[in-house]
């Protein structure tokens, strides 16, 4: 029991306090990994175009202008999106209703551009479905240490329950064999 209390205390220490900056703050988003920000990366060190054209974004352009242009494209796509796409319940703004598929399609080929504040907001509000994206969201929300602690506690609890079940089953079958033998 003492171990569980200590683990709970460590978990509470790992969670961010209300005064700390949220990982969803656009300034912090610059340091997020591409998977957490729903931004697809290059495959085999070559840029991948998702805009259905062979024209890749020129690296000489201003990164702010690129970010604003991309944000404008995303907003236009969000306005035209079918109502069947899922949104998170807390997404009330148009930017939050974007899907990853649309973001991937609209993403410029030059993936190393420094995104603007508005572009970061769009990427962060990108809606991704599936267990893998939910795991990344959980890590982003609670931190890697806390999620690792959750998993360790869960696995330990599962092992203890299985050990108890096995010992109970072994005792009951062992007594049954002795009774039959006597």
From Swiss-Prot:
Q: Which InterPro entries does this UniProt record tie to the protein?
A: US6 (IPR035129)
> Could you tell me which Pfam families the record lists for this protein?
US6 (PF17616)
Task: Please report the stretch or stretches of sequence annotated as the Ig-like H-type domain.
Answer: 30-130
Task: Specify where it is mainly localized.
Answer: host cell
Question: What transmembrane ranges does the database entry give?
Answer: 144-164
Topology check: give the Cytoplasmic ranges: 165-182
Q: Signal peptide: which range, if any?
A: 1-19
GO cellular component terms listed in the entry, alphabetical order = host cell endoplasmic reticulum membrane; membrane
Q: How does it assemble?
A: Interacts with UL18.
Q: What is this protein called?
A: Unique short US6 glycoprotein
Q: Which organism is it from?
A: Human cytomegalovirus (strain Merlin) (HHV-5)
């Amino acid at each position: 029991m003492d171990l569980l209390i200590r683990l709970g205390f460590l978990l509470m220490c790992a969670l961010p306090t209300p005064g700390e900056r949220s990982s969803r703050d656009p300034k912090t988003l610059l340091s997020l990994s591409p998977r957490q920000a729903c931004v697809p990366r290059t495959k085999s060190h070559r840029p991948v175009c998702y805009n259905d054209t062979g024209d890749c974004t020129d690296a000489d352009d201003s990164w702010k202008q690129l970010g604003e242009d991309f944000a404008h494209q995303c907003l236009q796509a969000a306005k035209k999106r079918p109502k069947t796409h899922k949104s998170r319940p807390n997404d009330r703004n148009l930017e939050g209703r974007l899907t990853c598929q649309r973001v991937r399609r609209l993403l410029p080929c030059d993936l190393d551009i420094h995104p603007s504040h508005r572009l970061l907001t769009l990427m962060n509000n990108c809606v991704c479905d599936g267990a893998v994206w939910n795991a990344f969201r959980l890590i982003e929300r609670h931190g890697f240490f806390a999620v690792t602690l959750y998993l360790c506690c869960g696995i330990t609890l599962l092992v203890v329950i299985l050990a108890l079940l096995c010992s109970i089953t072994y005792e009951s079958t062992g007594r049954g064999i002795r009774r039959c033998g006597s």
